[in-house]
Curated annotation (Swiss-Prot):
Cross-link (2-iminomethyl-5-imidazolinone (Gln-Gly)): Q62-G64
Name by which UniProt lists this protein: GFP-like non-fluorescent chromoprotein
Record PTM: Contains a chromophore consisting of modified amino acid residues. The chromophore is formed by autocatalytic backbone condensation between Xaa-N and Gly-(N+2), oxidation of Tyr-(N+1) to didehydrotyrosine, and formation of a double bond to the alpha-amino nitrogen of residue Xaa-N. Maturation of the chromophore requires nothing other than molecular oxygen.
A Pfam family recorded for this sequence: GFP
Subunit structure, as described in the record: Homotetramer.
InterPro entries the record matches: GFP, GFP-related
Biotechnology: Fluorescent proteins have become a useful and ubiquitous tool for making chimeric proteins, where they function as a fluorescent protein tag. Typically they tolerate N- and C-terminal fusion to a broad variety of proteins. They have been expressed in most known cell types and are used as a noninvasive fluorescent marker in living cells and organisms. They enable a wide range of applications where they have functioned as a cell lineage tracer, reporter of gene expression, or as a measure of protein-protein interactions.
Keywords, comma-separated and alphabetical: Chromophore, Luminescence, Photoprotein
GO biological process, one term: bioluminescence
Modified residue annotations for (E)-2,3-didehydrotyrosine: Y63
Organism the protein comes from: Montipora efflorescens
Role description: Thought to play a role in photoprotection of the coral's resident symbiont microalgae's photosystems from photoinhibition caused by high light levels found near the surface of coral reefs.
Note: The wild-type form is non-fluorescent with the color being pH dependent, ranging from yellow at low pH, through red to blue at high pH. The His-142 mutation produces a fluorescent form.
Family, per entry: Belongs to the GFP family.
């Protein structure tokens, strides 16, 4: 029997650096894990106002809150099975201009609340680039491909940040999900996601986000 209820809350504790600037973020979220819907309110508690675009942090809070993904019955849900022991993930983000982010997450559960401890490191963002100039305008919807390897779930996808004045800033995401106990492994599949910032103050020290996340088999399989 699953320990995950139809409605859950979660807490986010994130700390890290971007081009040497230290910051901390805390958040409170809620949603419906089996429907793939979630919202979160986030606050920069240290290091604000941030001298870089919020958008490089936003996926770590929701495309990071992986239990809130709607799975069909014929695809085993690797992440939900991992509880109550929980799971971890590690991520590398390679941007087209040579900037790199490494991220880790430790996800646990207590009652009807998930807790996410996130560590973030961003390096080599050009001072005149869209991240340090805060010229990004949110992520396009995307699809992550997922496959099993060595008891872990490997995710890979290309994501695109919209830019002021048009165009995109591209980034390749590689994520490794690791359950803290043996679980039934899914086959090759995809997760479609749409992440939006729905509200924020002027300097992005207070941000609200929502995400829809749905797993599926390949369309032409």
């Amino acid at each position: 029997m699953s320990v995950i209820a139809t409605q859950m809350t979660y807490k986010v504790y994130m700390s890290g650096t971007v081009n040497g600037h230290y910051f901390e973020v805390e958040g409170d979220g809620k949603g419906r894990p089996y429907e793939g819907e979630q919202t979160v309110k986030l606050t920069v508690t240290k290091g604000g106002p941030l001298p870089f675009a919020w958008d490089i942090l936003s996926p770590q809070c929701q495309y990071g809150s992986i239990p809130f993904t709607k799975y069909p019955e014929d695809i085993p849900d690797y992440v939900k099975q991992s509880f109550p022991e929980g799971f971890t993930w590690e991520r590398i983000m390679n941007f087209e201009d040579g900037a790199v982010c490494t991220v880790s997450n430790d996800s646990s559960i207590q009652g009807n609340c998930f807790t996410y401890h996130v560590k973030f490191s961003g390096l080599n963002f050009p001072p005149n680039g869209p991240v340090m100039q805060k010229k990004t305008q949110g992520w396009e919807p995307h699809s992550e491909r997922l496959f099993a390897r060595g008891g872990m779930l490997i995710g890979n996808n290309f994501m695109a940040l919209k830019l002021e004045g048009g165009g995109h800033y591209l980034c390749e995401f590689k994520t490794t999900y690791k359950a803290k106990k043996p679980v039934k492994m899914p086959g090759y599949h995809y997760v479609d996601r749409k992440l939006d910032v729905t509200n924020h103050n002027k300097d992005y020290t207070s941000v609200e986000q929502c995400e829809i996340s749905i797993a599926r088999k390949p369309v032409v399989a």
